[in-house]
Design a protein with these regions (language model features):
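Long, non-catalytic architectural segments outside compact domain cores
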Residues: 1-65
Length: 65
């Protein structure tokens, strides 16, 4: 997957997390469940970014030598 697709996925994941947080503000009875789901989407975004940059670092390391 190219960098543009990765960043688009991250943007989508963070948008979904934001929607969960916004919904949590208006649904006190479900707040903790919604915030947990938001946290999971944020973790997914972070994981995708980490994997992307780790792959770039692995690719760039032999070029630098």
């Amino acid at each position: 997957m190219n960098g543009h697709a990765i960043f688009e996925n991250v943007r989508r994941y963070r948008s979904i997390a934001s929607l969960y947080r916004q919904t949590a503000a208006f649904r006190p009875g479900q707040r903790w469940s919604l915030l947990e789901q938001a946290s999971e989407w944020e973790a997914r975004a972070l994981s995708e970014l980490e994997a992307y940059f780790a792959a770039r670092a692995d690719y760039a390391a032999p070029l630098a030598a």
